[in-house]
Swiss-Prot record:
UniProt feature, compositional bias: Basic and acidic residues: 1-10
Assembly with partners or alone: Interacts with cid13.
Organism the protein comes from: Schizosaccharomyces pombe (strain 972 / ATCC 24843) (Fission yeast)
Subcellular location per the Swiss-Prot or TrEMBL entry: Cytoplasm; Nucleus
Protein name per its UniProtKB record: Polyadenylate-binding protein, cytoplasmic and nuclear
């Protein structure tokens, strides 16, 4: 373990120092043995910068005995509330309760989650009834493995003014990847009481090579800097210094930019000599150093650096030589930048270009899918050219040049694009109904999908609570009585597909179309699905089956029973769907899908059918034809339902 070696190195450094520093360490050690708690806050969720970046855990400390620490850096915690970070997303309140309740009675636990997706944010708050239990948990459970990850525990600090005080905060960089939070804590604990300790990691959990240690006093921080700065930790020389806030660092960078003396030159002729290089830039002022970068064969690589004695000379060289030709090549001459500066500028430039591109095509770029393989760019452009001027039309293809079944059409104005969406969505092209909509960025689509999932989960939960209380499920719009399928489960057309509102103006059941069933024959099996009514007969005359403890639906009028249809259509094509009014297509598809879903998953057939009905009509038609695809979608829906059940404690299907 790296922590043992690091601890030994730190201890050796302390032993070799003078008595003054030893006293500082002793006073810090005394504090560690006391029961005085420290205060800490949750980490900032911003991305950390590699060079003295914004601290991931800005914190405050508690006042201690004046004899040991002259200047306290914060105030004691006012409640027995602990922050628990670095948690696996699957960690729940129950898991944390089992761990922390072993220390003492827990008042409450809250895992913080995203407001939309309800996914864990990776941290939680644990509240004890008394401070002693909080102190004990902090001492005994810090860095305990929870689902394979070491947790990080600190006192919770809600006051932002205290949270952003950097007193006693130390920044360490050039760390070996093997050094983790615990190893860093063990190394620096020799210099004083540590309030928080964190090694920065990327999205995959790999160490970024830098971290932060927050001491409870400036003296402890100074001792750590004096002893460890420049030391070899795991054979790597580390830098240790006081943490500098991002705002301060940025102001220093701006000052350096305004008074730069170091100049970077590229696009130099590869035959240039050092004397020619010196003569070229020496005419603008005194040069303190210059470097013409060469390869292993001692041949110039085409770039170099010149450092002037003052800023005016450097600025003059940039003004005079930038974009000027020298030996047949146009030079680039500018202020020398560090790597992270260049990367930041490139990132900002890329984001700006991306934003401009998005704004340019906002509202004029269309996404078209469900295209036949034979439809090419020219055919796509011809079909959509009637609605305005097209700047581009592209079918997306794979590596072999085969169509992926979707493409994009870009117009010059939003009005043209909206007209095309209105006219072409669901229109038949080469035997398939098109899906046409405004193109959206992946992030927007993902956020919309997450919002839909959240709304759906909340609606299901409301239905479950209402059912448990004996309250009938809410129906949007003035619908007639529920029509039930085999086994007493509602047919989606009658409940509008999992609570989806009916189209305004259509208050009754959907109109009949040739060959379209509206309910299964009373008392008998569904046509083509023998034995599906094993749970009991469907009520005759289209009356809704009343479940125990439920009350009748409060619809404005009783809908007439729709006569049963003798058989299911063998094949329902896109042309058949096109003949159905648009507002009723979902209901038609729902009645066709429900028996197929019922065979695969009887208990959840109504919910799953409602979930499937949120798909585009073209994809629903494919599910009717392709049993394997339908099986896959049903399994996905069951997985979503199961995930929701797992995430909601006490919730049962």
């Amino acid at each position: 373990m790296p922590s043992t070696d690091l601890k030994k190195q730190a201890d050796a450094a302390v032993e070799s120092d003078v008595n003054t520093n030893n006293e500082a360490v002793e006073s810090s050690t005394k504090e560690e043995s006391s029961n005085t708690p420290s205060t800490e806050t949750q980490p900032e969720k911003k991305a950390e910068e590699p060079e003295a970046a914004a601290e991931p855990s800005e914190s405050t400390s508690t006042p201690t005995n004046a004899s040991s620490v002259a200047t306290p850096s914060g105030t004691a915690p006012t409640s027995a509330s602990l922050y628990v970070g670095e948690l696996d997303p699957s960690v729940t309140e129950a898991m944390l309760f089992e761990l922390f309740n072993s220390i003492g009675p827990v008042a409450s636990i809250r895992v913080c989650r995203d407001a939309v997706t309800r996914r864990s944010l990776g941290y939680a708050y644990v509240n004890f009834h008394n401070m002693e239990d909080g102190e004990k948990a902090l001492d005994e459970l810090n860095y305990t493995l929870i689902k394979g990850r070491p947790c990080r525990i600190m006192w919770s600090q809600r006051d932002p003014s205290l949270r952003k005080m950097g007193t006693g905060n130390v920044f360490i960089k050039n760390l070996d990847p093997a050094i983790d939070n615990k190893a860093l804590h063990d190394t620096f604990s020799a210099f004083g009481k540590i309030l928080s300790c964190k090694v920065a990691v990327d999205e995959l959990g790999n160490a970024k090579g830098y971290g932060f240690v927050h001491f409870d006093s400036v003296e402890s921080a100074n001792a750590a800097i004096e002893h460890v700065n420049g030391m070899l930790l795991n054979d790597k020389k580390v830098y240790v210094g006081h943490h500098v806030s991002r705002r301060e660092r940025q102001s220093k960078v701006e000052a350096l930019k305004a008074n730069f003396t170091n100049v970077y030159i590229k696009n130099l002729d590869t035959e240039i000599t050092e004397q020619e290089f010196s003569d070229l830039f020496g005419q603008f002022g005194e040069i303190t150093s210059l470097s013409l970068v060469k390869d292993q064969n001692d041949k110039p690589r085409g770039f170099g650096f010149v450092n002037y004695a003052n800023h005016e000379c450097a600025q003059k060289a940039v003004d005079e030589l930038n974009d000027k030709e020298y030996k047949g090549k146009k030079l680039y001459v500018g202020r020398a930048q560090k790597k992270h500066e260049r990367e930041e500028e490139l990132r900002k430039r890329y984001e700006q270009m991306k934003l401009e591109k998005m704004n340019k095509y906002q509202g004029v770029n269309l996404f078209i899918k469900n295209l036949q393989d034979e439809v090419d760019d020219e055919r796509l452009k011809a079909e959509f050219s009637a609605f305005g001027t097209i700047t581009s039309a592209k079918i997306m293809t794979d590596e072999q040049g085969k169509s992926k079944g979707f493409g994009f059409v870009c117009y010059t104005t939003p009005e043209e694009a909206n007209k095309a969406v209105t006219e072409m969505n669901q229109r038949m092209l080469a035997g398939k109904p098109l899906y046409v909509a405004l193109a959206q960025r992946k992030e927007v689509r993902r956020s919309q999908l997450e919002a839909q999932i959240q709304a759906r989960n909340q609606f299901r939960l409301q239905q479950q609570v209402a059912a448990a209380a004996g309250i009938p499920a809410v129906q949007y719009g003035a619908t007639g009585p529920l029509i039930y399928g085999p086994g007493g489960y509602p047919i989606p057309a009658a409940v509008n597909g999992r609570g989806m509102p009916m189209v305004p103006g259509h208050n009754g059941p959907m109109p009949m179309y040739p060959g379209m069933p509206t309910q299964f024959p009373a008392g008998g099996p569904a046509p083509g699905y023998p034995g599906m009514n094993a749970r009991g007969p469907v009520p005759a005359q289209g009356r809704p089956m009343m479940m125990p403890g439920s009350v009748p639906s409060a619809g404005p009028a009783e809908a007439e029973a729709v006569p049963a249809v003798p058989g299911m259509p063998e094949r329902f094509t896109a042309a058949d769907l096109a003949a159905v009014p648009e507002e009723s297509r979902k209901q038609v598809l729902g009645e066709l899908l429900y028996p197929k879903v019922f065979v695969r998953e009887e208990k959840l057939s109504g919910k799953i059918t409602g979930m499937l009905l949120e798909m585009p009509n073209s994809e629903l038609l494919e599910l009717l034809e392709d049993d394997s695809a339908l099986n896959e979608r049903v399994n996905e829906a069951i997985g979503v339902l199961q995930e929701f059940v797992d995430q909601e404690p006490g919730f049962t299907e």
